[in-house]
Amino acid sequence: VETLLLQRLTGLLGMGKKAGDIVLGFDQVRDALQKKRPGLLLEAADGAEDGRSKVYFLAKALYSNVKMAGALSSEELGVAFGRERVIHGLVRKGPIAKATELAYQRLAGFRARPELDWFPDQDR
């Protein structure tokens, strides 16, 4: 079941990237945050704490109730986007973000959610 949920989530992420609704990379995510509220922040579970904190706290400074998905590894995120690894991503607010968040919540029922330990103020 977990594998199917992961495939569903990575499929949505790939579709979102093709539609132009997803931004990848630290600098691009930082720039996108300064322009518009994100639908969902993507952070690799095995990414460095420093970069993850910078992205999260910038988002929190600009917007309230920022949502983050952190249960996927950099390799799993990379598979979704046709890359070797992805550490930082942002799903722009809209239908893809809502569908991605729902798919992530379903997957999170089978996996640990490390973002809850990274940032205690994250929605549970």
Language model regions located:
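Catalytic cores of RNA-modifying enzymes
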Residues: 1-17, 105-108
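N-terminal first-folded block
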Residues: 8-43
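Solvent-exposed alpha-helical segments within well-ordered globular domains of core cellular machineries
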Residues: 11, 31, 53-57, 79, ...
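Short active-site oxyanion
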Residues: 19-20, 38-40, 63-67, 86-87
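Feature captures the catalytic cores and cofactor-binding loops of soluble hydro-lyases/lyases
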Residues: 47-82
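Helix-rich interaction surfaces within compact, conserved domain-sized segments
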Residues: 72-123
